[in-house]
Regions:
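A conserved ligand/cofactor-binding region detector
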Residues: 1-800
Length: 800
């Protein structure tokens, strides 16, 4: 339904009066935000009901997407935009002398995710809604999300991200649809008259209460639902409380509700590991119960479940959904084991996000057995049958069977549960999918090659272009029309204008304005001053050794030393922009943050260098900050060691906004370079086969350090340090083990950075490269990814 300005104005004024008892002229920005969000949510809710009615009427297959995190960011701007209400809302507010951007700023980022995994899941809800694929996401309603990051004297400090007070307005609770989840105790199996019975004893219950958010599709009637489970105690222990045992009464409630407090609690200790397993089973079990209940309400049988339901496991965190469905089919619905497993096999598919076998998730068998006793029994039987099936496929090869088995070395291997059960196993880039087949799951590829697929990641490109970069959007409309708004492949039409001087000049003007806007925002928000005429070189992603932010830092240190020794050298000013959180228990990542921040402070305080070089560390980097940065970016640092990054999606957002990729041929960088042309990116570093060969021979970082004067000087400089501080933890790691081969790629990275400077000085060439990237970014749309999943994995079709 479309709303006229008068209709929408009445909606907003009525809502302000009913909810806040204020007129629009007297309302605060927060009151306007909340009421505007309520209106938007209600419109999406109504549309979702209509959409779901069509889904059921047409008997469509429904897709359920299980993921530990959904990095939603802010909802108001994109929801209004996708609903076609952004302009009318802006006009209504303008009449009241209110800027809509002020209202957008009232909304906190939803604290439901951490990095690329969660942002991908959020983009796919948008893609499913836009494509008309009936989709529901499932996760946990984290009270505090990941954490708020503060940088104090170079050190990351974590504080609670209390996002719900401002974000609750998007969520509606449905306690009438709650599920009971059981942990601990014993599961007693008995047989009576040929029937199998399971009795639970001494278990602890937690109630999973569903809370729903909605994601509207663009130019579509589709609306995706995100169902988030909140943990509650089954009831308050009044008898303990009345007896004066207050701590006992409160602790039982607190223990249950701990499950939905925080995303990824520190698991460097046993208690943290148990809590993570409880989180995974809690949301997986609640989701499976919800899916099966909905299906039974519609069809009255589970016999046709595989025809009407597709469940995608995004990474291994929701793997326990598989044995949980087996449990329900066996224990509650009396299916034979073979029939139950056949249903699970047809329903479940698994997306892998790992390139290293040693990084695949495993659970200590004792923790698993004690926490999930019935699921442990089912997993043991799955392991027995898995071994029997593998023995037929690989007779006599016990080593291979043991490696592929579900249980081994006193561990439950969740990835092997997925590989054995799921009808489809997909990687998230062409290179990654080949690595899966060649190494990570090579034996399973030999066992069931037909199950292995590729679906390259995609992004909700309208959020990152139409909403975040209106200047570029307007230029594209003027140059190629507005077809790209609904069909990202239409961006390809820009390719014939990449050498058009008028278009180049217009694109450069847009980029300069975006850089100035970001510089102004940064100064207002943090007090930091950056030069909008410097090169904006950006690396924003999770802080991790494999992402190699320390490689970037080594080059900056090298440039600093070069400028100190050559003050009159030609050097295009550069602003290096970092944004990253380190996992709370990841010491080396925190040391890398400290090194980058201290290096930035050193440069800032050196008048001989600070006009040419600058480091900005964006504290508490999040989706809404990313939406400001991407349009201003010029260089996209994607510098992981070849063969370690599954795909990435930040690289796609940078590309879409015209940044040049400076990167290795890793993950989706390969497809970015293939699409835009390798000559339009700046590629460096070893290829995956070279990395594997070097590992095979035995990698010794000193062999690369000792022959490189710059490398030796930089490491010595960081070890010596300044102002009483040094960075021996990082440099010692690089000299002695260097697990991600930073020093092996350092020299070529320096060459790539030099090439970047030369290319940037040639404005015509740089603008050509930038426009080439924009014009070839359409293939990385989430719309395309979702249709690939629907066709190749889910067997789902759009609602007409």
């Amino acid at each position: 339904m479309k709303y006229t300005k008068r209709e929408f104005e009445k909606l907003l004024k009525d809502k302000l009066m009913s909810e806040c008892n204020v007129t629009i002229d007297a309302a605060s920005a927060d009151q306007i935000y909340r009421c505007l969000a309520m209106i938007t949510r209600q419109i999406m809710s109504d549309r979702q009901k209509q959409f779901q009615s069509k889904v059921l009427g047409e008997g469509k297959k429904q897709v359920y997407y299980l993921c530990m995190e959904f990095l939603m960011g802010r909802s108001l701007r994109t929801s209004l935009f996708n609903l076609g209400l952004n302009e009318v809302a802006e006009s209504v507010l303008a009449d009241a002398d209110v800027k809509i951007d002020t209202i957008y700023e009232q909304e906190p980022d939803a604290g439901l995710g951490n990095g690329g995994l969660g942002r991908l899941a959020a983009c796919y809800l948008d893609g499913m809604a836009t494509d008309g694929i009936p989709g529901t996401g499932y996760s946990i309603l984290y009270e505090y999300g990941i954490f708020k990051q503060k940088i104090v004297d170079g050190w990351q400090q974590e504080t609670a991200d209390n996002w719900l007070p401002g974000g609750q307005v998007w969520i509606k609770s449905h306690p009438d649809q709650a599920q009971e989840i059981r942990f601990d105790g014993q599961a007693i199996e008995t047989w009576e008259g040929g029937f199998h019975h399971v009795k639970y004893e001494n278990y602890n219950s937690v109630i999973a209460v569903p809370n729903d958010m909605y994601v509207a599709g663009y130019g579509s009637n589709g609306v995706s639902k995100l169902r988030l489970w909140q943990a509650k105690a089954p009831s308050f222990d009044m008898s303990s409380f009345n007896a004066g045992n207050y701590n006992t009464a409160i602790s039982q409630s607190a223990s249950a509700e701990l499950i939905s407090k925080i995303l990824y609690p520190n698991d460097n200790h046993t208690e943290g590991k148990i809590l993570r397993l409880r989180q995974q089973y809690f949301f997986s079990a609640a989701s499976i119960a919800d899916i099966l209940q909905n299906h039974l309400n519609q069809y009255g049988t589970l016999d046709n479940l595989a025809d009407k339901v597709a469940i995608q496991l995004n990474d291994t965190h929701p793997t326990v959904a598989i044995p949980e469905m087996m449990r329900i089919l066996l224990d509650d619905c009396s299916y034979e084991r073979d029939a139950a497993f056949d249903i699970c096999r047809k329903v479940f598919a698994y997306t892998n996000h790992t390139v290293m076998s040693e990084a695949l998730e495993k659970w200590n068998a004792d923790i698993f057995r004690n926490t999930l006793p019935r699921i442990w029994q089912i997993v043991c039987e799955m392991d027995r049958r898995c071994r029997a099936d593998l023995a037929k496929a690989f007779p006599g090869d016990q080593g291979k069977i043991d490696y592929m088995a579900i249980i081994g070395d006193n561990q439950v291997r969740t990835a092997n549960i997925c590989a054995y059960t799921c009808h489809a196993i997909n990687g998230v880039s062409k290179l990654h999918s080949e690595i899966i087949k060649d190494s990570v799951f090579h034996d399973y590829f030999l066992y069931k090659p037909q199950a292995f697929k590729n679906v390259t990641n995609g992004i909700a490109y309208r959020r990152w272009l139409l909403c975040s970069n209106p200047g570029l959007t307007h230029l594209l409309e003027e140059t190629i029309g507005d077809g790209f708004k609904t069909d990202a492949s239409e961006l390809k039409k820009l390719e014939k204008f990449v050498d058009d001087k008028t278009v180049q000049a217009a694109a450069a003007k847009v980029k300069r304005e975006n850089k100035a806007n970001f510089a102004n925002y940064l100064q207002k928000a943090t007090g930091q001053v950056i030069d909008p005429d410097s090169i904006f070189d950006c690396q924003v992603k999770r802080m991790h050794e494999y992402k190699r932010q320390h490689l970037n830092a080594l080059n900056i240190a090298a440039e600093y030393l070069y400028l100190k020794n050559n003050p009159n050298a030609e050097f295009t000013p550069k602003t290096y922009i970092f944004g990253a959180k380190a996992a709370p228990g990841y010491y080396m990542a925190k040391q890398m943050i400290r090194m980058i921040c201290k290096l930035g402070k050193l440069i800032d305080e050196d008048p001989a260098v600070r006009g040419k070089l600058r480091i900005v560390y964006l504290e508490d980097y999040c989706v809404s900050l990313s939406e400001r940065l991407m349009p201003a970016s010029e260089v996209s640092e994607q510098i992981s060691l070849a063969g370690t990054e599954a795909s990435g999606t930040g690289n796609m957002k940078f590309m879409l906004n015209g940044a040049i990729t400076l990167g290795t041929l890793d993950g989706a960088n390969v497809e970015i370079a293939d699409a835009a042309g390798h000559e339009n990116e700046i590629i460096f570093g070893m290829l995956t086969p070279e990395v594997n060969a070097l590992k095979g021979m035995g990698y010794h970082p000193n062999a690369f350090i000792n022959g490189d004067n710059t490398a030796m000087a930089v490491l010595d400089f960081l070890e010596k340090g300044w102002n009483g501080e040094n960075f021996n933890e990082v440099t010692s790691n690089l000299r002695n083990s260097d697990p991600y081969m930073v020093m092996a790629d350092f020299k070529d990275y320096r060459r790539a950075q030099h090439d970047l400077q030369e290319l940037y000085r040639d404005k015509q060439k740089w603008n050509h490269m930038s426009l080439k990237n924009i014009s070839n970014a359409g293939i990385f749309s989430a719309d395309r990814s979702i249709m690939d999943y629907a066709r190749d994995i889910w067997g789902a079709t759009p609602v007409k």
